[in-house]
Amino acid sequence: MYKRQVFILLVSLITIYIIKIQNIDRPSKRILYLYSLYWFISLFLSTLGLYDYKVPKFETLFCLCISCWALIGGFLLIKCPVKSVDLKQSGIQLSIRGFFKNKLFVGVLVVLTCYSLYLLYKFYTFMALGDLYQIRNLYFESGDLNIYGALFPNMNYWILKPFSFLCAGLFGFGVLYYRSKLLLLIFVMLFSLSSLGGGRLDYFRYLVIPLLLFGYCFYPKRFKVTLKKGFLILVMAAAMFFLLTIIGAGRRGYMEFDKESLDVGVEMTTENLMSYSYGPIVAFDYALNNNYLDKLGGYSYGTLTFNAFNGLLDIAFRMIGISYGTNFSDFVILKQDTWITLSRQNFDKNWNALFSWNFYFYLDFGIVGMIVLPFLFGFLIRKSIYWFYRYQNVSSMMLLSILFLSLILSVLDFNLSSIPIGILMIYLYMKSHNCKLK
């Protein structure tokens, strides 16, 4: 076991040194630091066997390290101007001002904010009648069984989530560099939608990670933690931990606001913060060693990683009466509806859904996929930074924030596989290039 820990420490130190000596722009370097630190901390924690979790095999850890290096290699392949952008003075200020005056966007935002508040009201109504665990199960049901109604699953997939991805970047940028009353509506909508499933990840996905991108990575100066900044970060962290504690207690059936509920919530939140850091790595190791590739019928050759576009082809062919076919539904059943145990002894660590984004890459092309696809993604995210520098408009900013979000959450899952997100990214790419500064 010590061999694994020494290996991860050695690789992480080499990686940080390689990043440090690169002559690249400050935001790019900070993004690489965040990605590398999160991955290698998670890999190291997975070797400790905390909370009775199994320890991944050395071969699995080695492949994951190579995958991390592949992304860094693709990222560094693109040459960006060694500069940054003053987000308070750049052309994006004019672009975002025009976007916030767009009547269609404002109208959709108002309607979806009202709808999200209605759903939040239903959430608290149901929470008063039952425990949060039951509510979460009903949140994922389809049709009339869904807690928010038969139309909600499609509304959530096609409209609410893509719009939330779009607004997350606006929120992170606007809170720090732009003042608008619409930011309050965006916050209310994102907070409400993040609460509906009784989960915790969406709070980080839509509210915390965008602030990390624009508050740290694109901070125009050397980042120093002053007393004021430290106090603000501490207050935000405490508020987030308290929120997660309340949710954790509710999922155990403790709905009262008392000491016992808080104790249970703190215990569950602490364990979950740890397990969600390395659990997906242990789950990925489990999948490698339990023939998940054979269960899916062999390699998928890109249909999982690029399901956002493969699904569009499937829809297009079906419209003309041709059965194109896709195995993504079988993959979802294998990934989300099949529960596994990651415990070494007690068999109480039930797990599903989160296997890291390498799960997609491996099932598509095997070990080669774990090298080539992260390399391409690293290439893409650095390219998106270049587009952001060059065009300085709201569309390039949103595209960058979506890719950054997927990068940071790569330890957990792959966030770019849904069809609506694929459509949104294509639209933002085209819009950013059409609106470039003259």
Pin down the residues of each PLM region.
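N-terminal "leader" segments that precede or initiate the main folded domain
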Residues: 3-102, 190, 206-250, 416-433
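Hydrophobic, membrane-inserted alpha-helices
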Residues: 12-15, 165-171, 185-193, 355-359, ...
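Small-residue-enriched transmembrane helix-hairpin modules in multi-pass membrane proteins
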Residues: 139-151, 244-377
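Membrane-embedded catalytic interface detector for glycan/lipid assembly enzymes
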Residues: 82-255, 339-342
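Hydrophobic alpha-helical transmembrane segments
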Residues: 6-13, 107-120, 156-168, 359-382
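Hydrophobic alpha-helical segments
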Residues: 350-438
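Membrane-interface helix caps and helix-loop-helix hairpins in membrane proteins
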Residues: 51-55, 195-203, 408-416
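Membrane-interfacial loop-to-transmembrane alpha-helix junctions, especially the N-terminal start
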Residues: 24-38, 179-185, 387-400
